[in-house]
Structure formats: C-alpha cells, structure tokens
C-alpha cells in the first residue's frame, strides 16, 4: 500500500502542526541547544550527563532506575521524519520543549498470539510518563545509534531500526527473550502516526510513532516475564475484551493507544490473517 507522505484529518492544519512543519533543521538545533547534531552524535545509547546529579525538580520523587533511563538518546526529527540529531529522553519529553515543536521517533508494538489475542500491558507505577495506564504490548523509542537509526535515511531502513529497538525493549520491559522474538513470529510495519499529548506535569509526548504488528507463529508461544519496574500487569485480550475494557471507567489508557484504537486497530485486527491490504503504508498520519 502506498500513499502520499503526509495526511491530516479532514484536511485540517492546526497552528501547532504549522509550527512543527515550518521548523528547519537549523531552527531545531538553534532552538534546542541540548540536541547533538546527527553528524556529531556519540553513537551511544545514553548521554553522559547524569540526571541523578542534576538536582532538577522535574525528577523529584521519581524512581531512580526510571530517572537513569531519561538519559537515553532519542532520535530528534523534522516534520518529514528525517533525523536531525540526538536528544535525551528527558529533553524530548518536557512539555516546555514539546510546546516549541520538539519531535522524536517512537514505535508501538502489538503482539498477537495464535488465537488472535492482543497482548496488553499496564505501565508500572514507577514510570515517569503515563504511569499505571493500560496500553499496547510495548511502546518506546529507537535510540540515536547506528543499529536503530536507519542511517541511509530511507523508510525501509528506519523500519528496520524501529524493529531492532522493539526486539530490545520487548526483552527489557516484558522479559521476552530476543532470540524468541526473532524466531517465533514476524513483524509487520503498518504505518506512522504523528501525535502530541501531555502527560503528568511537566511531561508529555510528541512523536512520529512506527506501528508494528507481530504475529506469533502457529503452535508457538513467547515467554512473558515482565520487569516490574516497567510493567505493572499484562493480559491477552480479544477485540470484545478490549471493547469491554474501554467501557469500564476503572481502566485508563495511554493517549497513543486510544488514537490507534479509535482510528485503525479494530479494522486491522479483522484483517490479521492477511495484512497485505493494510501494511506498509508509507504515509505519515497526522493526529495534531
């Protein structure tokens, strides 16, 4: 499936979308001096700056392990999903920066078993952004390193980078061994979604999110052994189970998961046996 590179709902262009669209790479690097230009990036997973020693109030009361993870180097983007440089997870998730248009790359994985059930997780209480909320199997960020960046700049290379990051994070968050992920199923790239959402103060999200389905092979399973610092709970659900959860006010969901469900998920789910009509959409779907 192919399409134009950009899509806005109902043809609408918000003032925020215009702000992000009009920023050049030079504008981004000037506005955010913490961003390391792509050619000068250290090719390391994390910044050498220690959030633990910063004394910043934005981390007051938060879990030490989660604070360390805020040093990870995310991929800072322009409007067209071109990598501009490396920015720490902290810098990329502060609302004061997001309000100025700072954008980064992310991925969202949806794992389905042989019965067509989707693996959901409830984010741990310790998470700095969107704690305790239910969401899809795994949501995180490719890092600004060679294996996850897509150095050639082509979409297929970026997809490979997102999948490499997904394999890493499925192990880190859910304890799914990397060798199992690589051999017991297959990833399918669906599309990219561009959205912005505030979290708890002072945090938020502004991402181009690579949507990845993963179908477990027939008669096989994946080991799920969650990292309690990342995942509070998990469950396998059918479409009807998920709709029941949405109708129950005791369940709270991440904003990106709600966007994906409201616009795409249930239609995609119906085509799970043959995703050829819906996968590999080259368009960036703007939800701003």
Curated annotation (Swiss-Prot):
Subcellular localization, as worded in the UniProt entry: Cytoplasm
Region (Disordered): 33-58
Free-text activity regulation comment from the record: 3,4-epoxy-l-butenyl diphosphate and 3-(fluoromethyl)-3-butenyl diphosphate (FIPP) act as specific active site-directed inhibitors of IP Pisomerase.
Positions of the Nudix hydrolase domain: 102-259
Pfam families cross-referenced by the UniProt entry: NUDIX
Coiled coil: none
Molecular-function annotations in GO: isopentenyl-diphosphate delta-isomerase activity; metal ion binding
Keyword line: Cytoplasm, Isomerase, Isoprene biosynthesis, Lipid biosynthesis, Lipid metabolism, Magnesium, Metal-binding, Phosphoprotein, Steroid biosynthesis, Steroid metabolism, Sterol biosynthesis, Sterol metabolism
Cofactor note as given: Binds 1 Mg(2+) ion per subunit.
Active site per UniProt: 139, 207
Sequence positions bearing Phosphoserine: 7
E.C. code: 5.3.3.2
Catalytic activity: isopentenyl diphosphate = dimethylallyl diphosphate
GO cellular component terms attached to this protein's record: cytoplasm; cytosol; nucleus; vacuole
Known cofactor(s): Mg(2+)
Chain positions recorded as Mg(2+) binding sites: 93, 104, 205, 207
Positions with biased composition (Polar residues): 40-49
Consequence when changing residue 139 to S: Reduces activity over 100000-fold
PANTHER family (alphabetical): ISOPENTENYL-DIPHOSPHATE DELTA-ISOMERASE
Family stated for the protein in its record: Belongs to the IPP isomerase type 1 family.
NCBIfam families: IPP_isom_1
UniProt name for this protein: Isopentenyl-diphosphate delta-isomerase
Species of origin: Saccharomyces cerevisiae (strain ATCC 204508 / S288c) (Baker's yeast)
């Amino acid at each position: 499936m192919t399409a134009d590179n950009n899509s806005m709902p109902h043809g609408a262009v918000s003032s925020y979308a215009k702000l992000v669209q009009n920023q050049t790479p030079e504008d981004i690097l000037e506005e955010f001096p913490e961003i390391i230009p792509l050619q000068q990036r250290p090719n390391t997973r994390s910044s050498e700056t220690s959030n633990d020693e910063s004394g910043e109030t934005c981390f007051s009361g938060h879990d030490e392990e989660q604070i360390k993870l805020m040093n990870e180097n995310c991929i800072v983007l322009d409007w067209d999903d071109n990598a501009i440089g490396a920015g720490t997870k902290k810098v990329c998730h502060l609302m004061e920066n997001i309000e100025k248009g700072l954008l980064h790359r992310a991925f969202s994985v949806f794992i389905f078993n042989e019965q067509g059930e989707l693996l959901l997780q409830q984010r741990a209480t310790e998470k700095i952004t969107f704690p305790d909320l239910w969401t899809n199997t795994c949501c995180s960020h490719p890092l600004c390193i060679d294996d996850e960046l897509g150095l050639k700049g082509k979409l297929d290379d970026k997809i490979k980078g997102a999948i490499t990051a997904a394999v890493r994070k499925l192990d880190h968050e859910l304890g799914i061994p990397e060798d199992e992920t690589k051999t017991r199923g297959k990833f399918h790239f669906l599309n990219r979604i561009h959205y912005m959402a505030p979290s708890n103060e002072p945090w938020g999200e502004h991402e181009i999110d690579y949507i990845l389905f993963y179908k477990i092979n027939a008669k096989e399973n994946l080991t799920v052994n969650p990292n309690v610092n990342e995942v509070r709970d998990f469950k396998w659900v059918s479409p009807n189970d998920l709709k029941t959860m949405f109708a129950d006010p005791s369940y709270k969901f991440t904003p990106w998961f709600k966007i994906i469900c409201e616009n795409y998920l249930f239609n995609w789910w119906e085509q799970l046996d043959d995703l050829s009509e819906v996968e590999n959409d080259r368009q960036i779907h703007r939800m701003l």
